C-alpha cells in the first residue's frame, strides 16, 4: 500500500499551471526522484508536498490522512535544500540537535542521536566544529544529518548536491542513498541531473512544463523513454525518425540512412515513429574487417567525422549517408580501441538488441 498518494495536484501562478494535474504514489521506504529541466515545476511540487505552498486543486494523502489543511509544522517532514540553511551561529552539534530540542528530547537522547548521526555521515568527532569552516561536502552531510535527526516520516531533498563539483556529487550520491536506505525513510528527491536521478532513485517521475511525462524505475525510464523529450533529456544521442515495417521474415525500420533490421526479441511500440540506437550497439570496422563479417544485416558504409575520449570510453562521430550517429567503445584491458582516424572510410554494424523504440 502506498504511503503517499498525490492525485490531480494543480498549482498556478498568474494563470500559468506550474504544476498541472500531477498524480503519482510513493511506497514506504522508496526513494522517488522528481527529475526535469529548470522551471518544469518539480520544486514547486515539492513545496506543495511540504506544505510551504497551497495547491489550487487535487489531493495529497499521507498514511491515510488528507494533508489539505495540515500546516507544514505538523507534517513531520524533513527538508534539505541546495542552499543548506545551516545556522551559521551554531556549531555542528547544535545544528544537528536543533530539531531534537524542538521535540523536547532529553539531553542524553540528543547526545546519543547526534553522535550516531555524525558517525553515519562519516563526520565522527566534528561536533564542536564551526559549520562555516567545513567544506561544501561536509556541510551537505551535516544538513542531511540535521534533516533526518527528528526521525521524519518523509524526507524531502531539493537539489541537495547542485552547488558541488561533479566528483563530490558522484561520491555523495552513493552516500545519501546508502544512508536513506539504512534508516528506511521514504524520500522525495528533486534534481535536474539525470545521472543523479538514475543513481539514487528507486522510481523516477520525469516532468516537463508542469506535467508528468513518464514514471518508472531508472532502468524503465532510460531504456524505454516515453517520447522524444524523455529520450533527449535522459541523454540518448542516436534518435532516429522513420517508419516501422514488418513481413514474415523480420521487423525493420526504414529511416534516412537505410533499412534497419530490428530484434524479434523486443516489442516495438513506435507511437512517435522513432528509435534509439544505443551508442554501445554500434561496432566499427575497416573495409578488410568488414569483408570477413558473415551477415551484412545492419552493416553500413560510413565516414569517421569525429573522435573523442569521454568518461572512460571513446566516442566516434560517424556519418552514414546524411545521418550522424555516435558510437562508443570501452577500451579493452590493454587500452586498445578501433584504429580509425577522422576522415577515414569505415563500416558500422548495428546490433539490433541495442535498439529501443518509442
Residue ranges and their predicted role:
Residues 35-37:
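The feature captures the beta-strand-to-loop junction immediately N-terminal to the Walker
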Residues 247-358:
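Non-catalytic connector elements of ABC transporters
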Residues 50:
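Helix-to-loop junction immediately C-terminal to a conserved catalytic motif
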Residues 58-66:
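Conserved ABC transporter NBD signature motif
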Residues 56-59, 109, 209, 241:
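Conserved coupling/switch loops of ABC nucleotide-binding domains, chiefly the family-specific signature
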Residues 72-78, 82, 86-229:
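ABC ATPase nucleotide-binding domains
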